[in-house]
Amino acid sequence: GTQATSKVRFDFKFSNWHNGQKMDMNDILHSLYFTMEWGTQTDENDKTFDVEFTPIASQAVQTIIGIKPVDEDTIDVYVNYWHFDEGEIADWAALWSSMPWEISAAMEQSVIDGKASFSRSGATNKNVSWISLIIPNDAQMIQSYLNDFSEKKYIPKSLESFETDFNYFDSRYTASSEWVEVNNHAVISNGPFYLSAYSPESRSITVNAFDDETYPFKLGYWSEFEKTKFPKITNVYSPDIIQKGTELEINIETSHADSILYFLTDSNGNSTLSELI
């Protein structure tokens, strides 16, 4: 089988989308599908190619070896990427979605049908609109696709192997379609604030707090980042006289640090030794 350089396991904290639907693994899987599908170009007639997005997405596609859903909120991601800092590997392999899969699917279909584009350059080249979920006309187009998906009992190929109950898909289509009907935009996400209203005429946007009990990060959760604690060397204990050929011991006291990078230089200022401890 194919070997990967690194494996990262993600345990997601899912909450409700702003339209009330529960975020789930299908949102993650469809997001990955989108990156893989739009990050490659099979030929010059490939309809899932965008002049701006595809070159960017292709960088991630080249390193993703595979994924393995473990349970309803856990997934293993295999990538050909390594870094001495494991946090960097996790960041590189991270999968997430900031919108429900059905919104992404409707956007994709509108672009494939030639009604819109994912980028400014693509819109200019094809003489179509640069799709924006906040613009009422584009939102109504998305709503039309959602209603069509519901009527035709459409199940995205990206999710066929993971979910078969059409009631689930229909509830997603209906909830997002109703959101557009009420709010006149299709911006649905999962953060602590949601877009309540947008008026192009008055150039005004109304944003409200998303007061939902499923949101995982309660008030004050991120407060520790408000006061940054910088690493600092508080004291250094070293002998006044150093004798050549004898062992040298230097004690260093620090605060808010878990490692120290030290280096030694000779009389000419050239570095002779460097090590992270």
What residue spans do the PLM features occupy?
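The feature preferentially marks the first beta-strand/turn patch immediately downstream
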Residues: 1-277
